[in-house]
Structures are given as C-alpha cells and as structure tokens.
C-alpha cells in the first residue's frame, strides 16, 4: 500500500461530528457483522436497517457482495486482497461514522487482525462487533449462492470454512445465535443500541 504524499494534509471540517450527530438525533457508529457465508449476516443487517429506518435513524448498509461491484472490483480473494478489501470498507465506514450515520457492514471478514484494524481506525465506542454465530452445517445447508457446493467440488478455492480459516471473535460486543428468528436477533440489536445510548427512540 502506497503512503500518501507529504503534501497531502487532512482537512478539518467546520461542521463537527458532534454537530452532525445532534442533527441526526443519534450517535454515529459501525455495526460490523461477521460470520460464515450463509450465517445470516446480510439478512439480519438488512432487517436491522429497515427497523432503524422506521425509527428515523440515518443508516447505510455496506454489503460484501455490493462493494466488490465497484469500490473493490479490482480485488480477488487472496489473503492480501481480502485484507485490502476490509481496509477500504473500514475507511468508508469511518467516513460515514464521521457523517453521523449508523453504518451496518456485512462481511465474512474472517481474520481477527483485520477486524481489529477497523476497530482501531473507527475508534472504541464507535465500533460494535456483531458475531452471527451459525454452525457450518447450517450455513452449508442454506448455501443461498451455491458456494459451498462449489467449494466441496473443488471448483472454488480459499473458501472460508472449507479450505480457508475463519477466526471467530473472542470478545464481540454482541454474540448472536444465527439459528434464531431474524426478528429476535433484530430486537437484541435494538436493545443493545438503546442500552449504549446510540439511539433513543
């Protein structure tokens, strides 16, 4: 990764993060959903965004597949590319947090080091790790994109959970049982956001 030129200086905005948060009526944070493919990350994140939208919370959902259509379309699935994928998403999420948004991200993000990298970039108190913990057998049975079948057949290499490791969070802010109903999981997340005074509605 290239270092920026010494003449590139960070520009401070006249409108502060606190002013933006006051305008939105809630704090800016990242909810980082992590888990195996098929664990329900995107489904739960989407349902939570819908619930937050109904509460007039300003949100944005960054989904793993979607960012690879544009922002990260040049990246593959090597360890180096996966790390760069997460770094870019972390930078975008951080900018959105500074805009006062509640940012939801749904990425396998299999390595603890990359998730920690984003946590440090965003800052403590503004990064909520959400572990959607679903057994591999359940994820494989769901297999919404047919990826596990391809991985088992040897047609897809470096697939997380099959021939590439997933490092489960050791101390996520919230640990969700991915076999529960989505409505139950959304309620647990809303309760967490209220308990941490991120949203008040």
Swiss-Prot record:
Record pathway: Sulfur metabolism; hydrogen sulfide biosynthesis; sulfite from sulfate: step 2/3
Protein EC: 2.7.1.25
Keyword ATP-binding: yes
Domain of life: Bacteria
Entry keywords, A to Z: ATP-binding, Kinase, Nucleotide-binding, Phosphoprotein, Transferase
GO molecular function: adenylylsulfate kinase activity; ATP binding
Positions of the catalytic residues: 109
Residues involved in ATP binding: 35-42
Enzyme class: transferase
InterPro entries: APS_kinase, P-loop_NTPase
Catalyzed reaction equations: adenosine 5'-phosphosulfate + ATP = 3'-phosphoadenylyl sulfate + ADP + H(+)
BP terms from Gene Ontology: hydrogen sulfide biosynthetic process; sulfate assimilation
Similarity-based family: Belongs to the APS kinase family.
Job of this protein: Catalyzes the synthesis of activated sulfate.
Protein name (database record): Adenylyl-sulfate kinase
Annotated organism of origin: Shigella flexneri
């Amino acid at each position: 990764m290239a270092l920026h030129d010494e003449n590139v200086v960070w520009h401070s905005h006249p409108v502060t993060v606190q002013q933006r948060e006051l305008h939105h009526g809630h704090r800016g944070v990242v909810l980082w959903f992590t888990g195996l493919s098929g664990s329900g990350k995107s489904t739960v994140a989407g349902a939570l965004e819908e619930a937050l939208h109904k509460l007039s919370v300003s949100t944005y959902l960054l989904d793993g597949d979607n960012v690879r259509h544009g922002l990260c379309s040049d990246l593959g699935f090597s360890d180096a590319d996966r790390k760069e994928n997460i770094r870019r998403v972390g930078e975008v999420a951080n900018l959105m947090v500074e805009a006062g948004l509640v940012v939801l991200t749904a990425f396998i993000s299999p390595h603890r080091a990359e998730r920690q990298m984003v946590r440090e970039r965003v800052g403590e108190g503004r990064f909520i790790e959400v572990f959607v913990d679903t057994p591999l057998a359940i994820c494989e049975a769901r297999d919404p994109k047919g990826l596990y079948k391809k991985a088992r057949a040897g047609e897809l290499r470096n697939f997380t959970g099959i021939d590439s490791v997933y490092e489960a969070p050791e101390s996520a802010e919230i640990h969700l049982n991915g076999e529960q109903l989505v409505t139950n999981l959304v309620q647990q997340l809303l309760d967490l956001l209220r308990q941490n005074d991120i949203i008040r509605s």
